[in-house]
């Protein structure tokens, strides 16, 4: 299955030497079981000094933002694909 969503983006990793004072996990609570058909865009924040695991933030079609469980098998595939595509375009 193809998981390219129109609003998908992978921001660059946080630069610890850049003085980013907001170095912490964005996703404290995650949800699994959200169907991709309800998602309008995705944002992947890779693991780094700010957070030990990747974070997957979904914007639902109704406008709500939620954090998806990065350990969910389906979401792991999405994260892997998005991070791979970022490396290819960098």
Swiss-Prot record:
Q: How is it modified after translation?
A: O-linked glycan consists of Gal-GalNAc disaccharide which is modified with sialic acid residues (microheterogeneity).
Please name the InterPro entries in this protein's record. Answer: Chemokine_b/g/d (IPR039809), Chemokine_CXC (IPR001089), Chemokine_CXC_CS (IPR018048), Chemokine_IL8-like_dom (IPR001811), CXC_Chemokine_domain (IPR033899), Interleukin_8-like_sf (IPR036048)
Positions glycosylated per UniProt: 8
Where would you find this protein in the cell? Answer: Secreted
> Ion transport: present as a keyword of the record?
no
**Region annotation Disordered: where it falls in the sequence:** 1-20
Q: Provide a GO biological process annotation.
A: cellular response to lipopolysaccharide
Modification type Pyrrolidone carboxylic acid: residues: 1
Q: Which SUPFAM superfamilies does this entry report, sorted A to Z? A: Interleukin 8-like chemokines
Question: How is this protein named in the record?
Answer: Platelet factor 4
Organism annotation: Sus scrofa
Q: Which gene encodes it?
A: PF4
């Amino acid at each position: 299955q193809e998981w390219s969503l129109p609003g998908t983006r992978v921001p660059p990793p946080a630069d610890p030497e850049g003085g980013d004072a907001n170095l912490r996990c964005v996703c404290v609570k995650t949800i699994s079981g959200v169907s991709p058909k309800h998602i309008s865009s995705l944002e992947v924040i890779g693991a780094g000094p700010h957070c030990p695991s990747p974070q997957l933030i979904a914007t639902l079609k109704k406008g709500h933002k939620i954090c998806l469980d990065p350990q969910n098998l389906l979401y792991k595939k999405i994260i892997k694909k998005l991070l791979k595509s970022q490396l290819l375009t960098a």
